Amino acid sequence: MSTNKRLRIAMQKKGRLSDESQELLKQCGVKINLQGQKLIAYAENLPIDILRVRDDDIPGLVFDGVVDLGIIGENVLEEEELTRTAAGDKVEYKMLRRLEFGGCRLSLAVDSDVEFDGPESLSDCRIATSYPQLLKRYMAEQGVPFKSILLNGSVEVAPRAGLADAICDLVSSGATLEANGLKEVEVIYRSKACLIQRKEPLSEEKQALVDKILTRIQGVQQADESKYIMLHAPKDKLEEITALLPGVENPTILPLAHDDTKVAVHVVSQENLFWETMEQLKEKGASSVLVLPIEKMLA
């Protein structure tokens, strides 16, 4: 059992995932200064230490029990898990929660003028990648033999440099591929950030803090996915109008001053309120429709 009294969380030192992880901690009420190049930062209001490391070091730190929690992309986590499993090493951790940021996809890409008719088009080809295990698993599932070329950066230049016939790399917008004369042809893995915990039991105090953080994360993510909707509805159309607004709980119905024919309706909706829905509400007689963002929510 871990005896250090402060909860240790590993997160990416820099990059988009780092920025989004910092924002999540901030929204969860963790006051911490992550400016500058400090490798370890300390929370001001909670017994939490943040270790800022390379993203591909985070899974190992959690697997080996060096830190208690890690915020990491699923692609990096699973690549390291497959690597250790292939080497016969033990892999132990707890998946606590998938996070709603850090989305990306791992895709196959070829020269823009190459015809692609499925993974079998790459039979016996050289494929450059920074994710050899995820690529190996996918190609094995497809029954396609290939040669893996391991590159730790600038994978997209491999075909033009004559190092590979195709690549397997992370894609966001596809602009980098296009700039290098490549086209995305097959998505082999979709990833988001996730929160993982060491397998070894934590102290009672630490576990209570982890549970508190998880509750706050749930509140933050529910708030991101929800909207607070307020409108005025004719009493004789109330049932039809509320049917258009699926909510977390039943709507709040309030009387309106100086108007006995209408009521105010307040509801927290977990579905996006599109223009089409608002137009349907208007057709049913709803008025003064307001759709507001929610910062925090505990359902």
Swiss-Prot record:
Family: Belongs to the ATP phosphoribosyltransferase family. Long subfamily.
Function as written in the Swiss-Prot or TrEMBL entry: Catalyzes the condensation of ATP and 5-phosphoribose 1-diphosphate to form N'-(5'-phosphoribosyl)-ATP (PR-ATP). Has a crucial role in the pathway because the rate of histidine biosynthesis seems to be controlled primarily by regulation of HisG enzymatic activity.
Taxonomic source organism: Mannheimia succiniciproducens (strain KCTC 0769BP / MBEL55E)
Pathway of action: Amino-acid biosynthesis; L-histidine biosynthesis; L-histidine from 5-phospho-alpha-D-ribose 1-diphosphate: step 1/9
Enzyme Commission designation: 2.4.2.17
The keyword Manganese is annotated on this UniProt entry: no
Activity regulation statement: Feedback inhibited by histidine.
Keyword Chloroplast found: no
GO biological process, one term: L-histidine biosynthetic process
Enzyme class name: transferase
GO molecular function annotation: ATP binding; ATP phosphoribosyltransferase activity; magnesium ion binding
Catalytic activity: 1-(5-phospho-beta-D-ribosyl)-ATP + diphosphate = 5-phospho-alpha-D-ribose 1-diphosphate + ATP
PANTHER family: ATP PHOSPHORIBOSYLTRANSFERASE, ATP PHOSPHORIBOSYLTRANSFERASE ATP-PRTASE
Protein known as: ATP phosphoribosyltransferase
Keywords of the record: Amino-acid biosynthesis, ATP-binding, Cytoplasm, Glycosyltransferase, Histidine biosynthesis, Magnesium, Metal-binding, Nucleotide-binding, Transferase
Cofactor: Mg(2+)
Places the protein is found: Cytoplasm
Chief location bin: cytoplasm
Record gene name: hisG
HAMAP family: HisG_Long (MF_00079)
Pfam families: HisG, HisG_C
